[in-house]
Regions:
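Vicinal oxygen chelate
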Residues: 1-26, 36-55, 59, 69-79, 84-85, 115-150, ...
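Short consensus segments that form the blades of beta-propeller domains
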Residues: 24, 94-95
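N-terminal beta-strand motif that seeds the catalytic metal site of vicinal oxygen chelate
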Residues: 7-45, 50, 101-104, 149
């Protein structure tokens, strides 16, 4: 790719290095969103008409009381989530503001370290179905859940 932007100045290089060394900067990679929907099958069917195919079959996540199915949209995954049962974070999001984003998903290099770091900052970890992910209730701060995956 050809860039028309001039090379970074010495000051810009130093500024970037300083900011990257900050303890709150992390190497998380944004990989997708969880979307609260009224019907996983209808949402997946609609996206299929747009040319986006499911990356998995619908499944039930008993720890978060929801049905989910992922769709690859370019480099991101849209995971459609439908509440199942009464105590569902997804259902809470639907009741509060209707269909839309309720979960931000990031890939991390060391799940145990990042989980410990977030818990040390006071974030509440909520149940997840496997050892490859950790969910945090950040609704008070950002009106979404935060999910880290290994």
């Amino acid at each position: 790719m050809i860039s028309l932007r001039p090379p970074a100045t010495e000051w810009e290089v130093a500024w970037k290095a300083n900011n990257e060394a900050h303890p709150l900067v992390n190497d998380w990679r944004f990989i997708g969103v969880g979307l609260a929907v009224n019907s996983v099958s209808e949402a997946a069917s609609y996206y299929a008409t747009l040319g986006f195919e499911p990356i998995d079959e619908p499944s039930i996540d008993t720890s978060l009381s929801m049905q989910r199915q992922g769709i690859q949209v370019g480099p991101l995954v849209f995971e459609f989530c439908q509440p199942v049962g009464k105590n569902s974070y997804c259902g809470d999001a639907l009741n509060r503001r209707g269909e839309g984003v309720f979960d931000l998903v990031f890939q991390v290099k060391n799940l145990a370290d990042e989980t410990a770091r977030l818990e040390s900052h006071g974030l509440k970890k909520i149940a997840c179905t496997d050892e490859q992910s950790a969910c945090f209730d950040t609704r008070a701060e950002g009106n979404t859940l935060l999910r880290l995956v290994a």
